[in-house]
Regions:
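C-terminal subregion of chymotrypsin/trypsin-like serine protease catalytic domains
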Residues: 2-14, 57-70, 81, 172, ...
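Extracellular/luminal ectodomains of metazoan preproproteins built from arrays
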Residues: 4-36, 129-130, 141-148, 235-243
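Conserved, non-catalytic sequence blocks in retroelement Pol enzymes and Pol-derived host proteins
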Residues: 29-35, 108-112, 161-163, 191-195, ...
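Extracellular/periplasmic catalytic domains that process cell-envelope and extracellular macromolecules
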Residues: 33-37, 56, 75-77, 91, ...
Length: 243
């Protein structure tokens, strides 16, 4: 219990000591992975560019972060998005699918990123293959010390300038703990940052978190929205967006 409390306090200390960055997180300390290793991973694209990550929940539902539905404070519409599935490369191969409807949490707060979660309904159902698969929602939070995987196309370095990969990245991170708002995971050298927002945090082939915010220079833990904490909202939102 002491170790669990210490890890959580460490995460909170990291994120309170520095400003938490809002959008677009990146993979730090990761490596190239193939889409078959994370077949639920998708790239949200706006104006032909990768903007955020997301996860396939079903043949027509994507889970992502609420702040991914905004561009410079402007609320985007479903028609503004294309979703690339089934490719390790954000800019080629796989399939591009249009979005029919979007819904973010009604209590989403853009200042502190609480309730930073959203769902999207695709305009046509996906064909599942070894490169395109759904991922189930976790029913409980993982214990501190659990190893999880985070993936995405976010920046891989920040100095001397931001460097973004074309190829999907993945990294194993340590679960630090949860509080009433967020799940924390990662550390200096192994974390998320600019471009990975909305992407998956996975334990035992289950979606446990959605990338939300990070330490200002992406050199500390990442805060995720807990999927188990938002499970009821997700299931209700998915049902409503299918109507």
């Amino acid at each position: 219990m002491f170790i669990q409390s210490f890890l959580l306090l460490l995460a909170i200390g990291f994120l309170s000591a520095g400003r938490v960055s809002r959008p677009e997180e990146r993979i730090i300390g990761g490596q190239n992975i193939e889409i078959e290793q994370a077949p639920w991973q998708v790239s949200l694209q706006v104006n032909g560019e990768h903007s955020c990550g997301g996860s396939i929940y079903s043949k027509d539902i994507i889970i992502t972060a609420a702040h991914c539905l905004y561009e410079k404070e402007r609320r985007l519409e479903a028609k503004d998005f294309l979703i690339r599935v089934g490719s390790s490369l954000w800019n080629s191969k796989g399939t591009l699918v249009k979005v029919a409807a979007i819904r973010s949490h009604e209590n989403y707060n853009s200042t502190n990123l609480t309730k930073d979660i959203a769902v999207m309904r695709l305009s046509e159902p996906l064909n599942f293959t070894d490169k395109v698969k759904s991922i189930p929602l976790a029913e409980r939070n993982p214990a501190p010390g659990t190893v999880a995987m985070v993936s995405g196309w976010g920046a891989t370095s920040t100095y001397p300038k931001l460097s973004y990969p074309v190829h999907l990245q993945g990294v194993d991170v340590l679960i630090l703990g949860v509080n009433q708002f967020f799940l924390f995971a990662g550390s200096y050298g192994q974390t998320s940052c600019f471009g990975d927002s909305g992407g998956p945090l996975v334990v035992d082939q289950q979606l446990v978190g959605v990338v939300s915010g990070v330490f200002e220079y992406c050199d500390g833990p990442t805060q995720f929205i807990s999927v188990s904490d938002e499970r009821s909202w997700l299931l209700n939102a998915i049902a409503s967006i299918k109507l």
